[in-house]
């Protein structure tokens, strides 16, 4: 089961061993992913329903072959479909928490100066970024003003443990894990046969995420 970006799927496929990718580029091998498009659609639709004046997505510059790119694509497509003003900031980068925080702080300051009086709907790539952004709001205002809504992604522990519990898109980790194991065992059982039948085409499974509404949205 591969969760890193170290080896491309073409290389992994050449080893001819049972292998499953989770949330990674997987053109040539089987994979299990969260339905990232659906998750971003849920997040964006919520911010639109809550009548935010401007929607902003904050992320790293994701490779288009990565499943997580669908979060960017869905955000943009949904905003354009409903004719909602939006901005996409893919400048997040850093090898440490403090490097990431410095970049998130720059983005926060830019948003503050560009959209001071508008209701801002912020959809962040994950709950770590969402918590950083939330802390910056509290450091400036001492509260969570009505001019902000925040949605994260993953439903990691930090989302519920934050100073204000964060609305997020929950990945069904238990379902992802079971599906990956089922696919892996299926491949392993096939290899035990006297004449193994190679998998014709890679199998790609998408697991539906769940919108978890908390205190950073209406």
Go through the PLM ranges and name each one:
Residues 1-42, 113:
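Alpha-helical recognition/docking segments in bacterial nutrient-uptake
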Residues 6-8, 63, 71, 128-130:
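Alpha-helix capping/helix-boundary segments
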Residues 15-19, 84, 145-148:
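A short helix->loop->beta-strand "cap" motif at the edges of active sites that frequently abuts
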Residues 32-57, 73, 77, 99-110, ...:
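Hydrophobic alpha-helical segments within soluble ligand-binding/sensing domains
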Residues 43-89, 196-217:
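An alpha-beta-alpha
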Residues 89-100:
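Short beta->alpha junction loops
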């Amino acid at each position: 089961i591969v969760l890193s970006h170290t080896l491309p799927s073409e290389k992994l496929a050449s080893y001819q061993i049972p292998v499953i990718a989770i949330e990674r580029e997987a053109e040539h091998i089987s994979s299990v992913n969260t339905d990232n498009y659906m998750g971003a659609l849920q997040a964006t639709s919520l911010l639109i329903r809550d009548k935010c004046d401007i929607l902003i997505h904050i992320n790293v510059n994701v490779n288009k072959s990565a499943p997580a790119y669908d979060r960017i694509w869905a955000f943009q497509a949904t905003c354009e479909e409903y004719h909602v003003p939006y901005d996409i900031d893919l400048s997040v980068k850093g090898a440490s928490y403090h490097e990431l925080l410095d970049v998130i702080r720059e983005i926060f300051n830019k948003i503050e100066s560009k959209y001071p009086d508008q209701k801002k709907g912020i959809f962040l790539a994950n709950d770590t970024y969402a918590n950083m952004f939330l802390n910056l709001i509290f450091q400036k205002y001492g509260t969570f003003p009505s001019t902000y809504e925040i949605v994260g992604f993953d439903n990691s522990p930090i989302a519920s443990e934050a100073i204000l519990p964060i609305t997020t898109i929950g990945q069904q980790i238990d379902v992802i894990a079971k599906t990956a194991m089922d696919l892996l065992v299926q491949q392993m059982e096939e290899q035990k046969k006297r004449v193994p039948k190679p998998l014709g085409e890679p199998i790609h499974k998408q697991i539906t995420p769940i919108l978890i509404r908390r205190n950073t949205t209406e």
